[in-house]
Swiss-Prot record:
Coordinates binding with substrate and required for enzymatic activity. This is Mannose-1-phosphate guanylyltransferase catalytic subunit beta. Its EC number is 2.7.7.13. GO terms for cellular component: cytoplasm. GDP-alpha-D-mannose binds at D109, D217. Enzyme activity is reduced by incorporation into the GMPPA-GMPPB mannose-1-phosphate guanylyltransferase complex. Allosterically inhibited, when part of the GMPPA-GMPPB complex, by GDP-alpha-D-mannose binding to GMPPA. The gene is tag-335. Keywords: GTP-binding, Magnesium, Metal-binding, Nucleotide-binding, Nucleotidyltransferase, Transferase. It comes from the Eukaryota.
């Protein structure tokens, strides 16, 4: 089988992390976001992955080719000269997707359990052109709702932000298509959700697969952290060995709840880590540090007695001693935060040195 991943554009919602690398390469649970998808695809026999890219293709190719080789997956880059929406990239990559076998299409922001084997079986059983994975949400009025037959899965309609209850399932950004869909898509900017799917549903060719378990679009910081929490909880409930805590944790340190610590990271004495924390490769956490609901990306350090809550610390950062960082701070790569400072909801661009408090939400340029 083949797959196409919609890599998209500039990753503006996840800035400043995406100012120094493409969004699919941002570390999520200690590996590039896209790698979670590629590993799951490889497990169900996908041997060719097309990346629909329009931004920093060279950086993506340099890193993801190494992972693709390890997984035995052929990587093809389909470069958009102009934005083509969510359907146009399929037309551009048509020659790579044509054939008798169905193919996957994924939005690169999505994290879930990726039940691709069940999706393939569902798609083959109904035998039509397309399958959309759908997921349950608590407030369907905020989304576009997919209306479908609950028994067979055939999609009847799409209702954008309904004011009256019509259902609670939304498009999860994971699809399987037969190559017939390619005849529906012109090589121009086209929305698959607004232009192609309604047409397919009207002709009875589109079915909904209900995702079991967790799902999150992690394209912005708040959802990135929520998705991380859901991912760690999934690792816990499935007793996954991904919840490694490594051997470089001081015996006086306390681990609370679901925590992932890369084996190459170190955690100092009397630290309290967790719940819902990911500590990346070669990170150094000094003594007495408290971290909760946060991720510390690779090669960063946190000084003595600092506090990090509900925040993302980018790569190669140095956070001083007695620093307090909270309320969805997003610290870009290679940032220095001096000792005894308070950052509240700050978004700090890469390569900055912070020497004053940021007491309210602000962008530090």
């Amino acid at each position: 089988m083949k797959a196409l991943i919609l890599v998209g554009g500039y990753g503006t919602r996840l800035r400043p992390l995406t100012l120094t690398q493409p969004k699919p390469l941002v570390e999520f649970a200690n590996k590039p976001m896209m790698l979670h998808q590629m590993e799951a695809l490889a497990e169900v026999g996908v041997d060719t992955v097309v990346l629909a890219v329009s931004y920093r293709a060279e950086q993506l190719e340099q890193e993801m080719t190494v992972h693709a080789d390890r997984l035995g997956v052929k990587l093809i880059f389909s470069l958009e000269e102009e934005p083509l929406g969510t359907a146009g990239p399929l037309a551009l990559a048509r020659k790579h997707l044509e054939g008798d076998a169905p193919f996957f299409v994924l939005n690169s922001d999505v994290i879930c359990d990726f039940p691709f084997k069940q999706m393939v079986e569902f798609h083959k059983n109904h035998g039509k052109e397309g399958t959309i994975a759908v997921t349950k949400v608590e407030e369907p009025s905020k989304y576009g709702v997919v209306v479908f037959d609950q028994d067979k899965g055939k999609i009847d309609d799409f209702v954008e932000k309904p004011q009256e209850y019509v259902g609670n399932k939304i498009n999860a950004g994971l699809y399987i298509f037969s190559s017939k869909i390619l005849d529906r898509i012109p090589l121009k900017p086209t929305s698959i959700e607004k232009e192609i799917f309604p047409e397919m549903a009207f002709s009875g060719n589109l079915y909904a697969f209900v995702l079991p378990g967790f799902w999150m679009d992690v394209g912005q910081p708040k959802d990135f952290l929520k998705g991380m929490s859901l991912f760690l909880n999934h690792c816990h409930t499935t007793k996954s060995d991904k919840l490694e805590t490594g051997s470089n944790i001081h015996p006086t340190a306390t681990i609370r709840g679901n925590v992932m610590v890369d084996p190459s990271a170190t955690v100092g004495e009397n630290c309290v880590i967790g719940p819902d924390v990911v500590i990346g490769p070669r990170v150094k956490i000094e003594g007495g540090v408290r971290i909760l609901h946060s991720t510390i990306l690779s090669d960063s350090s946190i000084g003595n007695y600092s506090w990090v809550s509900g925040s993302i610390v980018g790569r190669k950062c140095h956070i001083g001693s007695w620093v307090r960082i909270e309320n969805i701070c997003v610290i870009g790569d290679d940032v220095v935060v001096k000792d005894e400072l308070y950052l509240n909801g700050a978004s700090v661009l890469p390569h900055k040195s912070i020497a004053v408090n940021v007491p309210s939400k602000d962008i530090i340029m």
